[in-house]
């Protein structure tokens, strides 16, 4: 099947069925050009929204500038993160909301006036695991647990992470045996402090930036992410295992009754600066975030050298999603508190 011809014909049929004039097939990835911006009736807007979104997520066809556009956005985000500084302007409400968020994060992660540290070496190690993705040094080997644990080269970003993994596997006889077998086949854990950047299919217009990180780093990153997930679930009810279904329900209610709106934070993880995390989170969390992150990335395939990251992490890091969710949730609570808005969870959501 000719993918380009198929999507062109599909767009043409949809345009006619939805009541839009037939447009050139070259506009199928930018159908906004055929939509009347002055129409405000709900039925028209819904049809227009469907037409503008039905083909934009294709991963088969690609804009010739998609990769360069994604790389430029990543470089801009990294520059912004490096230049980050706290600036609340002259609005005391912003300062109050941020301070409330900081206090909330401290209460979550350092309860009982800081005498208890939720994020620590033991809690991270207990929750650590291997994920399904690829890691540095694996090459084209399968990413299943068997190969990561016992039959592939293994990498670590620092001596600390390497020694931590070597000690942690001794607590489980099966893991220790697997590591001994892996080491006999592939040698000791290699130090690889620089991550590898790649651009993965996302939509017609752009690509998703992912950084492949060392094996041992991702192992403990997922542990840190799980600890953060438990904290979120305990204090806010946010549960990553069911949250997508909840979000879909809320979006459906919002569409039907106009009581909710969804918001897409573009490149959110790329704009979480190291300075921002150091300011917002308690020190006991920041030290582990920094110890497990990959601070440099290799851009040589794109004509550049190694680059130091101003962002804490991006896609490919095991704690990225949990970290940004905790940060944004605390800030949201701070804004609600400042504006005196009660926080309520809809029934069934």
Tell where the protein language model's regions lie, with residue ranges.
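Core nucleotidyl-transferase/polymerase catalytic module
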Residues: 1-33, 163-349
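Non-catalytic, polymerase-adjacent accessory regions of viral genome-replication enzymes
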Residues: 1-198
């Amino acid at each position: 099947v000719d993918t380009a011809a198929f999507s062109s014909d599909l767009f043409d049929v949809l345009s006619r069925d939805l009541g839009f004039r037939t447009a050139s097939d070259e506009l199928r990835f930018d159908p906004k050009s055929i939509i009347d911006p002055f129409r405000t009736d709900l039925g028209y807007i819904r049809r227009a929204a469907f037409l503008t979104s039905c083909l934009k997520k294709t991963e088969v066809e690609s804009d010739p500038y998609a990769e360069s556009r994604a790389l430029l956005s990543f470089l801009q985000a990294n520059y912004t993160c490096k230049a980050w500084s706290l600036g609340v302007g002259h609005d005391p409400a912003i300062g109050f909301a941020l301070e409330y968020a900081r206090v909330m994060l401290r209460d979550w992660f350092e309860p009982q006036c800081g005498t208890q540290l939720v994020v620590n070496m033991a809690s991270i190690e207990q929750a650590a695991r291997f994920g399904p993705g690829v890691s540095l040094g694996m090459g084209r080997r399968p990413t299943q647990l068997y190969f990561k644990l016992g039959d592939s080269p293994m990498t670590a970003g620092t001596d600390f992470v390497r020694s931590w993994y070597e000690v942690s596997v001794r607590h489980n006889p099966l893991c220790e045996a697997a590591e001994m077998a892996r080491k006999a086949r592939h040698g000791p854990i290699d130090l690889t402090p620089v991550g590898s950047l790649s651009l993965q299919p996302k939509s017609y217009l752009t690509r998703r930036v992912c950084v492949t990180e060392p094996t041992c780093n991702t192992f403990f990153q997922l542990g840190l992410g799980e600890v953060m997930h438990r904290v979120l679930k305990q204090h806010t009810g946010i549960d990553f295992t069911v949250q997508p279904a909840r979000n879909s329900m809320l979006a459906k209610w919002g569409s039907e009754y106009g009581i909710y709106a969804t918001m897409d934070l573009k490149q959110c993880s790329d704009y979480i600066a190291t300075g921002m995390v150091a300011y917002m989170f308690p020190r006991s969390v920041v030290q582990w975030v920094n110890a497990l992150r990959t601070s440099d990335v290799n851009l040589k395939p794109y004509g550049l050298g190694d680059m130091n990251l101003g962002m804490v992490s991006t896609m490919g890091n095991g704690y990225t999603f949990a970290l940004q969710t905790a940060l944004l949730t605390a800030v949201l609570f701070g804004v609600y508190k400042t504006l005196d808005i009660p926080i309520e969870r809809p029934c069934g959501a």
